[in-house]
Regions:
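Switch/coupling segment of Walker-type NTPase motor domains
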Residues: 1-91
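Non-catalytic, charge-rich alpha-helical accessory subdomains
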Residues: 77, 82, 86-156
Length: 156
């Protein structure tokens, strides 16, 4: 069982209240602390993905726990962020070698996603990656999510 310590449970009250009972019943606990990473168990949440719903759950958790205090967020940008993160994590899960299925690679992908205001046809490395995936596997979850992200981004 994985517990995410976040702004909703900053003191870990759920872990404190339920942790021992879960351990006694054979559960293994993993703590992912998005407030203080030094107190986190330093595990890789991407290695616990088995299907699409796991990707969606992880993205929801990341977005919920990394939003600033009192920030409601514009639904348009929230949707675009959700689609982008979902597509990138799905790509890593389904297409990348196991050793690249981690947050470091996810951040590298995000960092290469520059845009060119002068050239509408410019494609960054991630665009090219997904263009290739769409040709090889047009029905892949990752390719479909990225296409939706690009459609949403094109609206702005």
């Amino acid at each position: 069982m994985i517990f995410y310590l976040d702004k909703m449970q900053p003191k870990g009250s759920i872990v404190i209240e339920c942790g021992n009972a879960l351990l006694k019943n054979g559960y293994k606990l993993k703590i992912f602390n998005t407030i203080n990473f030094k107190k986190s168990m330093h595990y890789n949440p991407l290695s616990y993905i088995h299907e699409e719903k796991d990707i969606l759950k992880l993205v929801t958790t990341l977005m919920t726990n990394t939003k600033g205090e009192g920030q409601g967020g514009d639904p348009f940008w929230d949707k675009a962020e959700r689609l982008l993160l979902t597509s990138l994590i799905a790509y890593l899960h389904y297409e990348a070698p196991v050793e690249e299925q981690n947050f470091a690679t996810l951040l590298e992908m995000l960092n290469t996603m520059q845009v060119s205001e002068d050239d509408e046809d410019y494609q960054n490395p991630v665009d090219l990656l997904f263009e290739d995936l769409s040709k090889k596997k047009p029905d892949s979850f990752a390719a479909r999510q990225y296409k939706l992200y690009k459609l949403a981004a094109g609206v702005t």
